[in-house]
Amino acid sequence: MSQVVIKQQAGPLPIKQSFMWPSSESIIVAVSGSAWTQKPNTLLTLQVLVDDKVLGTIQQLAGAASTHLALPTGFFAINRQISQAVLTLAAGNDTTVTDLNDQFTVALIF
């Protein structure tokens, strides 16, 4: 089964979404999105948090400045009890930039 909790939501980051966590079994959190930077040869970093705890980080080297880049899709495993949850996508450093031209999707696979 799968459940989309953020669907093609435009930036900027951070993006927060509250939802009911669907299972007490292990779940894979799949995250995709894009970002850009104002400086060439900079590491783009996207942090994925559940209940304000870092679940994982997605990184992509931006060779050119001012170009939106697709980030690699991140897959992160987590065990958690069924209850209300808050998922947050946030820039992982001060050189990662997002705006309304960047879109983010998060799906739970269980």
What is the meaning of each model-derived region?
Residues 1-25:
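Solvent-exposed, flexible loop/coil segments flanking beta-strands in beta-rich domains
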Residues 7-9, 30-106:
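Terminal beta-strand-rich extracellular "head" domains
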Residues 16-26, 75-82, 109-110:
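Extracellular and analogous surface-interaction loops
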